[in-house]
Amino acid sequence: MNAEALETLHQRLTLALQALPEESRRVFHGRGRCWEGLEHLTADWLQGVLLVSLFRDPGAAPLQALREVLETLTRSPQWPVDARLLLQHRYLPDSHTEALRGEVPEEWLISENGLRYKLDLGRKQNNGLFLDMRYGRRWVQEQAQGKRVLNLFAYTCGFSVAAIAGGAARVVNLDMARAALSRGRDNHRLNGHDLGGVEFLGHELFKSWGKVKRSGPYDLVIIDPPSFQKGSFALSRDYQKILRRLPELLAEAGVVLACVNDPDVGPGFLIEEMAREAPELAFSERLENPPEFPDIHPDSSLKALVFKRR
């Protein structure tokens, strides 16, 4: 991260500050490798917080230079009054977040597609909502009317919130992280949703197929796993186990949204494995990613693929 890269960052963020979005958005996506020297840095506008995240230790001198560049932004006429500036060190075991302006809030409320979500800033590696899945949540909201939805690896239930907002008849959320599911309940309550049609299962998926199947069949199944979760999920080893179960979980005209966010795994992985493990399902389309997530290699970015029962 040399002086030229930092100047590029300063220019890009200055432009972003001149036209900040009303909702939360990524405003700089270095991980798409479109800007040399900034491949390990992102910046998100979270409606009153500019969160800059570093995914690799740049070294002491470049880090201090980065701090100085960011702090100059807060003195510019474009800087919003009372906005906070946070720098998250994602490469550290505790993903430490330092406040360069203002304080690190314990909780923070944002909106996306007209829906509200609660974030954790400064306490965890991930803050509670993956912004690159914005179009995926919008698609679910558009498809959900009257549907029975299964949301696997639900995390904080962003897909569930979108589905209920779109008129889903019922949503079953499954994730082994009960604290994340609890935040999912909070997100539903933030949006005034009746939780009578929402189920939260804090179980390990591969030990819970019976319970999942009994709550079906489902009109829409969403699969959005981590690339690797120590002790419970490895994408290359375990995704196939889910795909082969889909025919018994889906309703007659069932639809699947299958996702992968590993830069080393292209969309062909899901298409080929689905054809092998669940040939009853045909590939329909790959959802577009938001434009604020440019990638020099599009197949390295988020893959959200739609499959439909033949």
Question: What is each stretch, according to the model?
Answer:
Residues 1-47:
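Non-catalytic accessory regions of SAM-dependent methyltransferases
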Residues 36-37, 42-44, 65-130, 138:
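Non-catalytic substrate-recognition/targeting regions of SAM-dependent transferases
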Residues 146-155:
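Conserved class I S-adenosyl-L-methionine
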Residues 156-168:
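Conserved SAM-binding loop of SAM-dependent methyltransferases across substrates and taxa
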Residues 170-175:
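Conserved SAM-binding motif I beta-strand of class I
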Residues 176-222:
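S-adenosyl-L-methionine
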Residues 205-279, 287:
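S-adenosylmethionine
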Residues 270-310:
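Class I S-adenosyl-L-methionine
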